[in-house]
Structure formats: C-alpha cells, structure tokens
Amino acid sequence: MVKAYLKFVQDKVFGLISTSNSILDGSGKLAITGCGERISIWDLRKQVLNQSLYEEDIKAEVTNVCLSKDGALLASGYSDGSIRIWSMSDYQLQAVFNGHRGSVTTMTFNRLGNILVSGSKDTEVIVWDIITESGLFRLRGHRDQITSVKLLERSNHLITSSKDGFIKIWDTETQHCIQTIVGHRNPIWGIDVNPDETRLCSCTSDNQIRFWRIPSNERQREDGSGIEPKFIVNTPINSAVIIPDEINEDGSKKENSNNSNNNDIDDLEIISEEEFAKYYGSITVKAESVSGVRFDPTNKILAVQSTGKFVDLFKITHYDTMKLEEISIVEEMRHRQTIKTSSKVRFFSFGNDIKHWNKFVITLAGNSLEAYEIKEKEQGGGAFEVSSTLDQAGHRSDIRSLSLSSNDQMLVSTSSESVKVWNMKSLSCIRSIACDYGLCTVFAPGNLHVIVGTKTGTIEVFELASAARVASIKAHEGSVWSLVLTPDLRGVTSGGADKLVKFWDFELIASQENSKHKVLNLSLTKTLKVESDVLALKYSADNKFLAVSLLDNTVKIFYTDTVKFHLSLYGHKLPVMCLDISDDSTLIITGSADKNIKIWGLDYGDCHKSFFAHDDSIMQVSFIPSTHHFISASKDKRIKYWDADKFEHIQTIEAHHGEVWSLAMGSVGDFFISGSHDRSIRIFNQTETPIFVESDRQREMEQTWEATLEDDTRMRTKEMLEENAAAGKQTLETIMAGEDILDAIELCVQEKFKIDEYEKLLKTTKNQDEIPLYQPNIIMLGLSPSEYLWNRINRIRPSDLEEALRVLPFSVMRTLFEYFNLWVDQSGKSVEFIFKCSFFLIQTHQNQLSVSTEFIPILQHLNTSIKNRLQKERFTLGFNRSALSFVKREIEINQQYKFFDSDLYLNKNNKNNKDKDSNNNKKDNKKDNKKDNEKSLKRNRK
C-alpha cells in the first residue's frame, strides 16, 4: 500500500502592509491594498487590519486593485492574469475573469460600475461586462506593458498608455484605434484624465508633464451623439506623426518639423485625419523622473509622483471658458507644495468620493502606507498633514531570520532595520526595536531576552520587557552568520565571517543605569579557529557533536566537549548554506547553493543520498521533531517537504512571492513558520488530510501543462495580429468545463435512447405487467435528460462559458441545437442564456453549418423561437419600465424631492427651509404632473 503523509497547508499570513497599489474607500477611513495573494483593508484611524479578502486556492500575487465609483465593487488583478470582483458590502467574491496572459497592471471602472477595463503585461487591453460576467472584447496594438487605462464615457472612448512610449485612443463602439500619440522618448509610466474629461496628461522618465486637450461638451454635437465622427485611416509607416515636442501650443504642427524621417518612430498605425486629442503644452517638475500623475475628484489638484520621495501638488486654476484658448498650461497648473515621504514612493491615489477629495494615500516601497489630508488655509495656499501611518505591522526589508520561543507563544524576526517580536495568537507586533542588520537570532532561556547576530559582527541582547538593548558585544570581525543555543541552555555559540567559532556563556551583570537591576550578558569561554568563513552551526541533540558549515563547500564535525575534529563532509560544489541534525542524532542534512540536498550518516559521515532539490540556492533545512522528515526552503520561492528515510519528495508548497530566507519549526512539529524576501511571515499547519505522492505529482503535471496553454512565446497567428479579438482565455478549468458538457451530452443521448426504447416496448407489448419498471440512471439524480443538461451547462462560470463551448466537437452540435429548441419553448429557461450559447456556437462552426443541410430546419426553428421569446421579453421589460417610471413620478410628486436624490432624501426633515416660491408653485406643478401621468398611463395601456 502507498504510504500516506499528512499535508501541510498555509494557515495565516502576517507582516505585510502593502505589496501593490493602495486606494481609499468612499468614506476615506479605509485603505485597500494588495498583500501578497490577499487583499487587505486597513482601518487608518485605528491602524489595524479590518478585513482580508482571499480564496484558499489563490497562489498568484495581487498586482492591482480598483474600486468602482460608487464603492460597491472591488476589482483585484493578479500576477497570473486573472481578475476577481468582490462585493464591498459583504466582502464576498462575485465573479472571476480569465483573459490576460500576464500580470494585470492597471484597471478602471466606468461610472455605473458595470464595465471594467484592464491592462496587462501581455500588451493587451480587455473590456469586461460585470453584469453578464464575461469579456466583451480585447484590444491589441501596444508593444509593451500597459501602464494605464482611462475611460471617456461622454464620448465612448478609451485611452491607454504603455511602456512602448505610445498613447492610444480607442473608439469603444468600433473597437479600433482612432489616434496614436507618439513622441515620448521614454516609457510612459502613467496617464490621467481630469473629471471634466477635457484634459489628458502623461508622465515619463523625465521631469516633464505633458498635456492634451480633449473636446469638451460644448464642442460635441448637439444631437447627443458625442464627438463628431472621424474616419479611421490606416496611414502608411512613413506618414507624418504628431509629436508633442514639435507642436505649437495652438495644436498646429511647426513648420520646420519633419516627422516622417524621425528614427524614433517606426511601424505606427495612425491616426485619424483630425486628431481627437490636441497637444496643449507641458510643465516642469522638480524631480528628475516622474512615475505617476493623478487628478483629484473635484478637479482642484493635480498630484505628480516622482521616482524618489516626493509628491508635487499643483493647483488647477479654472478660467472662463471663452478665454480657455488664450491661457497656457503653465498658467492653468500652478505649483502648490511638495510632499516629502519617509521612503521611496511606490503608488499614489486619491479617493473616489468628492466629499473627501482632500484625502489621499501613498504606498511606500518599504512595506508601509501613509495617509495625508490637505488642509485649506484662510489666506490662500494650503498645507497638508499626515493623518495616519501604517508601518508597525511589518518589516521594511527582507526577513532574514526567525526564531520561536520555547513555548511557541512568541516569534522574533529580524531584518535590516529592526527586530520585531510577534504574539503568535493575535499575530500582532508586540515589540519593535531598532537594530543593525540582523542575520540570525535566538530566544534566551526563559523567553525574556532575544539575542541577535548582526552583519557588522556584533551580538546584541535585547530585553523584551523594556524593549531595550542591554548588551552589545563586538564578537566577530565579519558578519555573524549563525547563532545557536547550546543543548544545556547555558550559553550560545556564534560563527562568523572571520573564520572563528566562539563559545559564550550567559551571565548576569549590573545595569549601567541601575546597579540593583541585573541584565543578561555574554562572556567568551573559548574560540575555535577554522579554515574558512563559518556559514551555519548546529548541535546534535545528545550534545556530542557540533556541525560547522564552511565557505569552502565542506561541513566539519567536531566533538562538543573537546572541540576536536571528528568528520569532514565534502561533495557539494558550492558553499553549504544550511544544515540540521535529527533528534536521534543519526542523520545530518545539508543544503547548498548548488541546489542540492545531501543526507549523511552522522556516525561515519557517509552520504546516504544526494538529490537535486530546488531550482535555486537552498537557504534553510529543518527536521520535523522526532521524525526523519524535513522541510527545505529556497530562493526559488518554494518550500518542500521530504522523507529522509525513503529519499522521497512528499509535497511542494508555493506560497511566497520572493526568496525564502528563514524557517522556524514548532516544538512539536505540527507547524512551521517561514520568512521571505516578500516581507511576509507565513504559518503552515499540519492537517489530518493525507497526501499521496503520486496524486500530487499528477496535479503538478496538470499545472505545468496548463501553463503552456497560453504561452507568450508561441507563434502569433493572423487573428492575434488584429486590433480587436475575443476576451476569453483557455485554461484548465475551461477545458474541464467543456469536457463536463461533453460527458453530459453523451449521457443524455444514451438516456434518451433508453427511454425511447422503453416507450416502444410499452407500445408493442400487450401484457405490460411482464415489463420491469424503468430504472433511470442514478447519475442524473432523477432529472430528465433535458433538465440534467441544462443544469450542467448553467453550473459553468459565465466568464468560462465561451471557452468551454469552444472545446465541444462539431459532432455534438446537432444534439445541442435540438436541446436549444426544446429549452427556448419553455418559459422557465433564460432566453438570453440560450441566445448567447447558440450565437457563439454558430459563429464558431460557421463554415461547417453553412454547408450542412441537416441543420437548416433546426436553425430556422431556433431563429423563429428566439425572436418570439425576445419580443415577449422586450414587451415585459417595456411594461415594467413604464410602470416604474409612473411610480417614480408619483413618489416625486408626493414627497417633493427627486427619486434617488440622496442629498435631498437625507435632508427631508428640512423641507420647511425650502424657498417660498417653490411652495407657492407646488399645487400648480402637481396638477400638471398628474395630467402628464394620466396621459402616459393611457399610452402605456394602449
């Protein structure tokens, strides 16, 4: 029988504050940001985590978050190209979209929140329908990562920017590019459009912010059709291109410019005969390089984010519209003030709500957030203040070492700037102490002190009660790479880059501040000189041996009592970064930078097994107490579970998004903790769920195969070179969903055949008592074939439906269309769903259907039935809409305020403060409205 092991699963994640962009909610009190594969919602006032949104099976990192304008929906983009929609009312997952083949870099909602536009590293833009949970279309044209997308809803246009240096303006109705703005010499890091949709600004890797005029409402056609139509012209490559540096401020091209010979411009598909956006001018900022621009919701402030520690605020001056053409952009955008942050600015965002326009949040590169509020002064100008700072819940840099207390109640972690102590129950940081670059750490016996070895060669002792450094000892000339407690708990042993192993005993000395107070200190007892730098140390549990890993790729075994040489373990091609000894002192495992793990016998030093374990350097190995199972961690971001007796790989854990530097094993072995370059600390618990090695290998093979389904390196077909395309993407889930439909169709065909045969038998047999009762297929759960197939198709996620139907072969199309005819005649079935499926299948198999005569009557009947059903649905919707309009007018008449007007509705108790003129005209207006309502009601009845 195959041996089953118990599975380790990730339980909790902490230490992360922000790894993606951050946004404010409508109230301005909550900050929403990505933390690894989770979305964290922080309470800015209390500085605590309010909510965490995630799915158990998500492994990809959150790369972008976006909130709808009304704050009802939250979209999160991931590094695997997927997008998830969450409800902000109950924090539940609403929809999942799969369409991108690279990380999602930017997203935006429309004003109603029913359309989402996303851009990705795969150079493509996809427009999604939130209501139907499906993709509308895909836009291609950029040659590098999409950096920003903006919707112009008043004119049905979409603006995109990319690292290829181009800004493209798309017509969302024709799904084609109508203008390409070129001339940026560097990648475009961001664009933004003001709330009035009259200004477009862009930023790149220089100190210039460039602006373009967008036609305003006054310049749009009076018939309400939006911007005047422009013909889309496929201009040859050598055609003239409008470049910002060669344009006059009035939008005309300079006479001496000759863009057709510009070497920076190639392979462009341009532009309409008349440009939609016209160059306006540019302003200069103090920073050498700019990485982001943002308008506030009220169009009062333009914020410019630099690549350093600065955010510049520009005040937008609003002039009379008649003089708009006469002013320059420098006069319109006036520098107001500069905000300097504590570390490098990573992202910047205003809130969506106009009421809180003066609040914004800055995501810093050091795993922290800062919330600001702009304060208006009485005499012009303005000031700002930091309203909240989130930095205590995580480290600013990599987590280099972890150590658990003896009772597993506390955890200590070190990084380049501090030592943090965590409560393992609440996962809150209870102590944060400034420290040099900590490379290793241990708890002193009693769990009242923490000992840290630093990169500068000192050993520092911290008292947890006072959160103070009580001792700092210059132990080594180089970095202290390893620090371990002696098995008798009387001292510690350190190994450093100065080729020395030093043995220290604990002692209590009088405090310098208070002579009566005793503090912990270390006294040197002996020193061991070795041939090379010491990288790792480990005592055997029986206190007989000390294993020392050296920079010369070997491991030396010494006797603990006499410090005499015992064995030398050699065979690694690169230095041994970590090692561990089993509790029974029989096995020693070594992990090296050569990506191999070796299992040795501690008695004779023989190598039991050597195997290629990871794809990068192995940083930590640790035995599970009282077993020969061990955990390894590597710079390839993976953690692996092994059996040292059978030399078997049991489980691979892919949880971190950066190099895994450290491990801490629980005292019983039922859990372990890992720390990583991504600044996260993760707890993995051992469950009662058995894991079978062979089944786990099969699952890994499926994941590898899925990764090849949409490979960016594959040949680009003619369809992929078109500007617009379908939004779906083939995944393992869509293939399995298509196979599920195919299995259901085959089962329904077999069951239908059995039912027909049974009915024939009933008709031909005189004595029906001799015929046994029909036994339906138990898999169908007592449903008819039609109902069973309907349920199976409806179970598929709407965003995966089209790709699942694409898997079906043409041989089952006749059966499927016959069921469509059956369903469309039933009132309980959704005609929209039937139409969507049938229309997609007809488009997919158009060539075969056009030459097949057997489908003609089926499709004709389906066409007629769908038209009739849609006509009925249209009549029902029209009647309901008219009835709702009538009810709405009645409410407005009776309650004296407009329906859905939140401000008037909330202030309905202040009706007596209204103008006297409106009260005098109330009766006349009511009579006129009643007459209009009666006329509309008669019209609707007809």
Swiss-Prot record:
GO terms for molecular function: snoRNA binding. Pfam families: Beta-prop_WDR3_1st (PF25173), Beta-prop_WDR3_2nd (PF25172), Utp12 (PF04003). WD repeats lie at residues 9-52, 57-96, 99-138, 141-180, 183-222, 285-324, 394-432, 434-472, 475-514, 529-568, 571-612, 613-652, 655-694. InterPro entries: G-protein_beta_WD-40_rep, Quinoprot_gluc/sorb_DH_b-prop, Quinoprotein_ADH-like_sf, SSU_processome_Utp12, TBC1_cilium_biogenesis, WD40/YVTN_repeat-like_dom_sf, WD40_repeat_CS, WD40_rpt. It is found in: Nucleus, Nucleolus. GO terms for biological process: maturation of SSU-rRNA. Keywords: Nucleus, Repeat, WD repeat. Residues 912-942 have a biased composition (Basic and acidic residues). Residues 909-942 are annotated as: Disordered. GO terms for cellular component: Pwp2p-containing subcomplex of 90S preribosome; small-subunit processome. It comes from the Eukaryota. Belongs to the WD repeat WDR3/UTP12 family. This is WD repeat-containing protein 3 homolog. The gene is wdr3.
